[in-house]
From Swiss-Prot:
The gene is dhrs-4. This is Dehydrogenase/reductase SDR family member 4. It is an enzyme of class 1 (oxidoreductase). InterPro entries: NAD(P)-bd_dom_sf (IPR036291), SDR_fam (IPR002347). PANTHER family: DEHYDROGENASE/REDUCTASE (SDR FAMILY) MEMBER 4 (PTHR43943), DEHYDROGENASE_REDUCTASE 4 (PTHR43943:SF2). The keyword Ion transport does not apply. It catalyses: a secondary alcohol + NADP(+) = a ketone + NADPH + H(+). Its EC number is 1.1.1.184. Substrate binds at S148. NADP(+) binds at residues 14-38, 165. GO terms for molecular function: carbonyl reductase (NADPH) activity; catalytic activity. It comes from Caenorhabditis elegans.
């Protein structure tokens, strides 16, 4: 959704997993408000297509690099690439996440459990460690994690995924306390059911299926979310408009009652 704000002129942001869905919407919003943005994703073709999409909309201060977010070598390449392209880092959006398991939590294998935590939790922690000195050098900035409402309200079938997102709530709070001295704010978003490829299996069945899902999930606003619903909140958390907010997680779920 286009914005008339220009809150990020002169700022540089990294957005992980940013070639589709929520990540792409976040990158577009930050670019639209004046930021220079580096997008990351595993697939170079997806990176190239996302950059072309953004540039066709007149958002030219964008670059991207392919890599696996759980690879320490690729994490460093992403940070180094950003510094080479734009000279600094002010904002990090840890948007990445996977959910390879569906079923009862006790049926999740050790291998899948470890993979969930490696990508959903550890990779964002490692990225934060890498960018920390660069953001601190600029006098501070913002780091945002993409968690999930499943951190608070474990939906059937994705409990293991939800545990990793609950962990992100704790990690966000811990990092907020640890980085406050450097004027780096750490916050997060906890989206509900957002219409993306990752959640498509839940809602892909026409209006009747969506209506049934909103009823089952008890979504007060009566609709599913879209990526722009998340992008606007991330832009707020990345901006000086939220300069007195850190360690918080904003639930974006249309009124679903989800709290720890």
């Amino acid at each position: 959704m286009p914005s008339n704000c220009r809150r990020f002129e002169g700022k540089v942001a990294i957005v992980t997993a940013a070639t589709k869905g929520i990540g792409l919407a976040i990158a577009e919003r930050l670019l639209d408000e004046g930021a220079s943005v580096v997008i990351g994703s595993r697939n170079q073709k997806n990176v190239d297509e996302a950059i072309e999409y953004l540039k066709n909309k007149g958002l030219t201060k964008v670059a991207g690099i392919a890599g696996h977010i759980a690879s320490t070598d690729d994490q460093k390449k992403l940070v180094d690439f950003t510094l080479q392209k734009f000279g600094k880092i002010n904002i990090l959006v840890n948007n990445h996440g996977i959910n390879p398991a569906f079923g009862h939590i006790l049926e999740v294998s050790d291998q899948v459990w470890d993979k969930l935590f490696e990508v959903n939790v550890k990779a964002g922690f490692q990225m934060t460690k890498l960018v920390h000195p660069h953001i601190a050098k600029e006098g501070g900035g913002a780091i945002i994690f993409n968690a999930s409402y499943s951190a608070y309200k474990s939906p059937p079938g994705i409990a293991a995924y939800g545990v990793t997102k609950t962990t992100l709530v704790g990690l966000t709070r811990a990092l907020a306390m640890g980085l406050a001295k450097d004027n780096i704010r750490v916050n997060g978003i906890a989206p509900g059911v957002i219409k993306t490829k990752m959640s498509q299996v839940l809602w892909d069945g026409g209006e009747d299926a969506e209506k049934e899902l909103t009823d089952i999930q008890e979504i007060a606003l009566g609709r599913l979310g879209v990526p722009d619903d998340c992008a606007g909140t991330v832009a707020y958390l990345a901006s000086d408009d939220s300069s007195y907010i850190t360690g918080e997680m904003i639930i974006i779920a249309g009124g679903v009652q989800a709290r720890l």
